[in-house]
């Protein structure tokens, strides 16, 4: 005969790991070629000059230089674009 009532079970109690998305290098920061600038889903921030786009929409620097973000209007919407201003040799 049990001396304690059985505790109920729950189907909850789990959580997935965070995706760690977002801006990794901000405007004015110096970067090296290959540095990740933005991790994102979809093209929230667009690639500008000297910036490449990965298959998961990750933006990365193609050259050494300084990060520069800009806003521009496209089809009556304000969009964001990121460029790398190359470092002077």
From Swiss-Prot:
InterPro entries listed in its UniProt record: Ribosomal_bL27
One Gene Ontology CC term in the entry: cytosolic large ribosomal subunit
Region described as Disordered: spans on this chain: 1-26
Keywords: Ribonucleoprotein, Ribosomal protein
Keyword Thylakoid (UniProt): no
Stored Pfam families: Ribosomal_L27
A biological-process GO annotation: translation
Keyword Cell inner membrane in annotation: no
Sample GO molecular function, one term: structural constituent of ribosome
Cited PANTHER family: LARGE RIBOSOMAL SUBUNIT PROTEIN BL27M, RIBOSOMAL PROTEIN L27
Family affiliation: Belongs to the bacterial ribosomal protein bL27 family.
Name of the protein: Large ribosomal subunit protein bL27
């Amino acid at each position: 005969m049990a001396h304690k009532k059985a505790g109920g079970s729950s189907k909850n109690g789990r959580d997935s790991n965070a995706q760690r998305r977002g801006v990794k290098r901000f405007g004015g920061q110096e970067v090296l070629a290959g540095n990740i600038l933005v991790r994102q889903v979809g093209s929230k921030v667009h690639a500008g000059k000297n910036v490449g786009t990965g298959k998961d929409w990750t933006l990365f620097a193609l050259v050494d230089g300084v990060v520069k973000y800009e806003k521009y209007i496209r089809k009556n919407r304000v969009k964001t674009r990121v460029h790398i201003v190359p470092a002077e040799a």
